[in-house]
Amino acid sequence: MAHEIEIDSEADLGRTTFEAEDLYKQRTPITKPPAPRLQSRRASMQETPWTIKDSFNVETKDVVQRCIHTLIPTVNFFDVVDDRPDLYGPFWITTTVIQALFFSNSITEYARYATGHGTSGYSIKKLISAASIIYGYTTIIAVLLWGILVWNKCNPKLLDCLCLYGYANIVWLPVSLATPPFGLLSTLASHIVKYVLTGIGLLISIVFLTRNLYPICQQAGSNLCKLLLFGIIVFHCLLALSLQLIFFS
């Protein structure tokens, strides 16, 4: 039995040609809109936990600028820091001051020996004393102040306190380097000049500390603020007196 197959020549058997528009669409790659890099970067920075390495990530020009504003405390130090406190500057400043104190004392002792008023040589005990006083004072007082402020709900950052007290030590560097030449003067004149230099360093550092800590301490109340500032001044005077008697006398 024969079957007849009818083929519809007009039927749509599929498209056999490409239009120019379809070909262009196929060749054109699909591009995605650019991701907001700034927002994603900020989000990643906020999500990244703080590490001790971050506090040493500071440029030399920033450290120099902070040292200048410490010696010339005309602006708020935390405005200069701009929420980027560091430990790199405080560590090297404190270490350099310790070495400068030891060097200054050794040169002074040699000058006294050369003029027949003392014995030559240096004492390693002075180096240990310098390290204990400077490192101990900077760390203990900063942590103690931070703890008191946190207890009174002022919520300062520990890194800010350590950074502030660390940079405050820079004033003792020029003082320690300026004292040896005056060891050749008479005893009375030498003592007067050294006390004047120590007093200048003390005054500059007190102005620097109180100027920057006053707005923070004020959050704890007027009475406690006065007490804290008084304690800051007293402890800093004790530091200056210790340096004067041990290294500059």
From Swiss-Prot:
Bilayer-spanning residue ranges: 87-107, 131-151, 164-184, 188-208, 228-248
One GO process term, biological-process aspect: vesicle-mediated transport
Subcellular location: Membrane
GO MF, any single term: small GTPase binding
Topology in membrane: Multi-pass membrane protein
GO CC annotations, alphabetized: endoplasmic reticulum; Golgi apparatus; membrane
Taxonomy, superkingdom: Eukaryota
Main localization (coarse): membrane
Entry keyword annotation includes Transmembrane: yes
Keywords: Membrane, Transmembrane, Transmembrane helix
Family indicated by similarity: Belongs to the YIP1 family.
Oligomeric and partner information: Interacts with the YIP1 family members yip1 and yip4, and several Rab GTPases. The C-terminal cysteines in the Rab GTPase ypt2 are essential for the interaction. Interacts with snx3.
Function description: Possible role in vesicle-mediated transport. May be involved in proper membrane localization of Rab GTPases.
Protein's name in the database: Protein YIP5
Native source species: Schizosaccharomyces pombe (strain 972 / ATCC 24843) (Fission yeast)
Organism taxonomic ancestry: Eukaryota, Fungi, Dikarya, Ascomycota, Taphrinomycotina
Gene: yip5
